[in-house]
Amino acid sequence: MDIDPYKEFGASVELLSFLPSDFFPNIRDLLDTASALYREALESPEHCSPHHTALRQAILCWGELMNLATWVGSNLEDPASRELVVSYVNVNMGLKIRQLLWFHISCLTFGRETVLEYLVSFGVWIRTPIAYRPPNAPILSTLPETTVVRRRGRSPRRRTPSPRRRRSQSPRRRRSQSRESQC
């Protein structure tokens, strides 16, 4: 079976493959981030979102892989074979789990549409010959505001004032979104 864990989220393994392996933070940092930002929702018996569910599954899979690595370390007699198995788990399986964790944490943090826009932007940037592309890759947290998903029913803010209207001298106040619910 060819199962793509990103398909239902509008992405694909191929789309994430444009990001180099050293782009993704280490597992410990990703797990700490997930815990710091989404612990309550991840531990809740309530269903919050498909991203929360996928994040839970990735965390559980990593735990099981660590159990396997520990078992192999304890039970495989040959040190060279033991090292090969542990290395394979850390490098190959670890990368897949790091990609999954990064994707779902990013979708929960920035919004799915923003993350997909970032993946497409990065894919275009990396495939553009060096002579023709900007020196710096796109950065997820600095994507233009136009990629931010807005709630339905609200019209988007105007980007520039009309020529007849003068801009106020006082800074605009932004509405702060309440973080009452973690979901």
From Swiss-Prot:
The keyword Transferase does not apply. Residues 155-177 are annotated as: 3 X 8 AA repeats of S-P-R-R-R-[PR]-S-Q. Phosphorylated by host SRPK1, SRPK2, and maybe protein kinase C or GAPDH. Phosphorylation is critical for pregenomic RNA packaging. Protein kinase C phosphorylation is stimulated by HBx protein and may play a role in transport of the viral genome to the nucleus at the late step during the viral replication cycle. One of its GO terms (biological process) is viral penetration into host nucleus. It is found in: Virion; Host cytoplasm. Keywords: Capsid protein, Cytoplasmic inwards viral transport, DNA-binding, Host cytoplasm, Host-virus interaction, Microtubular inwards viral transport, Phosphoprotein, Repeat, RNA-binding, T=4 icosahedral capsid protein, Viral penetration into host nucleus, Virion, Virus entry into host cell. Its main location: virion. A motif (Bipartite nuclear localization signal) lies at residues 158-175. Residues 177-183 are annotated as: RNA binding. GO terms for cellular component: host cell; host cell cytoplasm; T=4 icosahedral viral capsid. Residues 149-176 have a biased composition (Basic residues). InterPro entries: Hepatitis_core (IPR002006), Viral_capsid_core_dom_sf_HBV (IPR036459). One of its GO terms (molecular function) is RNA binding. Homodimerizes, then multimerizes. Interacts with cytosol exposed regions of viral L glycoprotein present in the reticulum-to-Golgi compartment. Interacts with human FLNB. Phosphorylated form interacts with host importin alpha; this interaction depends on the exposure of the NLS, which itself depends upon genome maturation and/or phosphorylation of the capsid protein. Interacts with host NUP153. Self assembles to form an icosahedral capsid. Most capsids appear to be large particles with an icosahedral symmetry of T=4 and consist of 240 copies of capsid protein, though a fraction forms smaller T=3 particles consisting of 180 capsid proteins. Entering capsids are transported along microtubules to the nucleus. Phosphorylation of the capsid is thought to induce exposure of nuclear localization signal in the C-terminal portion of the capsid protein that allows binding to the nuclear pore complex via the importin (karyopherin-) alpha and beta. This is Capsid protein.
